[in-house]
C-alpha cells in the first residue's frame, strides 16, 4: 500500500487589493509568511498554487511578514480581492 502525502493548508490571509496590470496581490496577513513558502489562492471556484518569490511591505523588499502586516506579492495568475490565501506545508 502506497501512502499518499497529505499537504496541510493553513489560512494566512486575504487579498485586500489586486493590481491586474502588474499582477500583484496585496494580502492582509493573519499568519506568518516568508519567501520560499508555497501559497494557494482560493476565490469562488477558482484556485491556484505558487511559491512566494518576492514580497514587499510599503514598497520595500522584505523576506517575511507577520500577522496584521499588509504584504504585496507578485502572482502568476489572476486573483481577486477577498480571495483567501493558504500556506501549504
Give the residues covered by each predicted segment:
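Beta-strand/loop-dominated core regions that host nucleotide or nucleotide-derived cofactor-binding catalytic loops
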Residues: 2-29, 33-89
Amino acid at each position: 500500500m502506497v501512502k499518499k502525502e497529505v499537504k496541510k493548508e493553513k489560512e494566512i490571509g486575504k487579498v485586500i487589493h489586486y493590481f491586474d496590470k502588474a499582477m500583484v496581490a496585496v494580502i492582509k496577513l493573519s499568519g506568518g509568511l516568508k519567501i520560499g513558502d508555497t501559497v494557494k489562492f482560493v476565490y469562488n471556484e477558482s484556485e491556484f498554487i505558487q511559491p512566494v518569490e518576492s514580497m514587499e511591505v510599503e514598497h520595500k523588499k522584505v523576506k517575511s511578514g507577520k500577522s496584521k502586516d499588509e504584504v504585496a506579492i507578485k502572482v502568476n495568475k489572476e486573483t481577486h480581492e477577498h480571495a483567501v490565501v493558504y500556506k501549504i506545508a
